[in-house]
Amino acid sequence: DFSNKFYATPLALVARKGTQLLPQAEALKGKRIGVQRGTVADNFASRFWADQGVEVVRYARQEEAYLDLEAGRIDASWLDALMADGGFLSTPAGVDFAMMGGLIHGRNADEKAVIGEGVGIAIRKQDKDLKAKLDQALAEIRANGKYDEIRKKYFAYDIYGD
């Protein structure tokens, strides 16, 4: 079993600064968007963008997408925001790039079904009391502001979602 979520990894569109791209099919029509094969970002782009005129370019490793992004062979990369922020965007190679158009936790039920509900703490099924205590503690720190206080030390954006 799992506790209620304590974070949900949003997706982010990373592109060269000054680019006016948004993580929406209509805004990306005719663009080449890089994704790591087999990831949530790949599943999302395949389901919601590929048949809307967005060219989804798949890579075995995210680092390959970054190289093509730097070289201008793709217009943007679509990936886990935590990976973008803690990886490429925090390196010298990423200085001219940024997350564009906000983070996506899932704007509707279909998108949320692809992105997922978030990450909870794994608990043995028989530990129902422990699950209840963890769920209560998570709710309390969300309600009293401690969660956001801790989150702001490490992330400049919402990692919880709805």
Language-model features and meaning:
Residues D1-D162:
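Proline/Glycine/Serine-rich low-complexity intrinsically disordered segments
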